[in-house]
Amino acid sequence: KEELLMLKERQGSIILCRIKLAEAILLAANEAYHLGMTEEATKLFAGFRTGMGMGGTCGALSGAIGVLSSKYGTREDLKTICADFVAAFEQKLALGTTECRPLAAKYKQRQTLSDAVELTAEALEEFIDKLEGKAPAEGCTLRSEDIKRVKGMGF
């Protein structure tokens, strides 16, 4: 999907520039979903780096919650939306946790944390599509050629 690929591409360039996960998710989604946030506003998420500096809640998750808050902040069910996304995040990253330390331990064993960013981007895209009625009930999937294209970009 074009939005997901754009989200992943933007995150890749942000990660390469050494911006942390919370800001990477937020900046990429801001561009992909036209949220209208200034780069200055995204600095509000700098404190969510490395689990708020102590290995707590994953920065990528914090950034994704920021995206959901920006898109759906006026909805009465925002609390449920966020809780449902946290569950989707835990399932997608396959550790059943939102904590930075165990996630970093798993994903640092790979080349970089870009796998965690990619999985968070996928979870966010699938979640938003489902929430907006765009995805089938079982969730959306990437085509193999999309994955190959993104991996060819250094992910």
Describe these PLM feature segments:
Residues A83-F155:
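C-terminal binding/interaction regions
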Residues I25-F45, K92-T98:
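Acidic-glycine-rich active-site phosphate/pyrophosphate-binding loop
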Residues T50-V67:
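Glycine/serine-rich anion-binding loops at beta->alpha junctions
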